[in-house]
């Protein structure tokens, strides 16, 4: 019985089915963290969203090309009708490590989309930046494709603050004592420097920042919590073996010499599946 390894194998299988090759030397924890990071990157199109435009983007729209305007409207329609927006996403969406372009997503939940589909032979260098909260997607701005440290764009945060200040974790009553240059922000956040100067105060990452590995802190914390719960359930199943065997006999099933469990997921719950008797024990809801 090794539920953590079972979960890693479930995650590995799903990633492989999505065309993502998972290195065999990754340990169980790494596989699960990367799975959550990549899953977050793909965006959830299973629900319908409303779309809100910033004042700045509304003003800029007439200056964009007809193809760019069409792409933005198409993305809006896809969000409203539960159609995938993956065709407008970066070709790196299936990469197992994206050092810079995931930076805004992991820290502030800010996505970016190309204004051409990945099948069109992209030549347009502009990106649409947006930030979801609940069932509303906030279209922030269309800006040139950043490179390197330019992925940290203070003007994006200015637009967010001027239109939807509640989307930022902004503290006007706190001011960092050390200024972090834009080109060092990514590395500073990995070293747990969380407060960045902003409008006389500071902003904190909306999604708890990144770990020293560069992985999303929320993903790392979620995997740690799940692993702890799975370990606790392994101990609980061993502790309740006599009780479980009584239930097996009541069901008039053949009692195996050794109870062997495999972790499965059914209807949003983690399930302990006993491979000899085929009994299923509900553990806890998948968070």
Regions found by a protein language model. Give the residues of each.
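Basic, Lys/Arg-enriched alpha-helical interface segments
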Residues: 1-126, 133-287
């Amino acid at each position: 019985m090794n539920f953590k390894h079972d979960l890693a194998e479930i995650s590995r299988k799903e990633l492989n089915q999505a065309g993502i090759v998972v290195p065999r030397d990754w340990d169980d924890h790494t596989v699960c963290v990367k799975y959550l990071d990549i899953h977050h990157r793909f965006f959830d199109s299973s629900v319908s969203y409303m779309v809100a435009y910033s004042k700045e983007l509304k003003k800029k729209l007439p200056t964009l090309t007809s193809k760019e305007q069409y792409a933005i409207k198409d993305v809006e329609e896809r969000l409203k009708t539960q159609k995938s927006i993956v065709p407008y996403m970066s070709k790196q969406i299936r990469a197992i490590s994206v050092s810079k372009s995931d930076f805004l997503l992991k820290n502030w939940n800010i996505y970016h989309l190309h204004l051409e589909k990945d099948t069109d032979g992209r030549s347009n260098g502009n990106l649409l930046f947006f930030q979801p909260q609940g069932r509303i997607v906030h279209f922030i701005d269309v800006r040139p494709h950043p490179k390197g440290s330019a992925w940290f764009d203070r003007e994006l945060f200015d637009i967010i603050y001027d239109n939807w200040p509640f989307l930022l974790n902004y503290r006007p009553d706190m001011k960092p004592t050390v200024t972090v240059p834009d080109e060092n922000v990514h590395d500073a956040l990995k070293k747990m420097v969380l407060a960045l100067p902003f409008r006389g105060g500071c902003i904190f990452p909306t999604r708890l920042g990144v770990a020293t590995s560069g992985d999303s802190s929320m993903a790392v914390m979620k995997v740690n919590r799940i692993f702890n719960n799975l370990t606790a359930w392994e101990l609980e199943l061993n502790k309740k073996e006599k009780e479980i065997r009584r239930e097996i006999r009541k069901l008039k099933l053949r009692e195996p010499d050794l109870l062997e469990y495999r972790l499965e997921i059914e209807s949003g719950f983690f399930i302990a599946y006993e491979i000899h008797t085929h009994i299923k024990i509900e553990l806890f809801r998948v968070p």
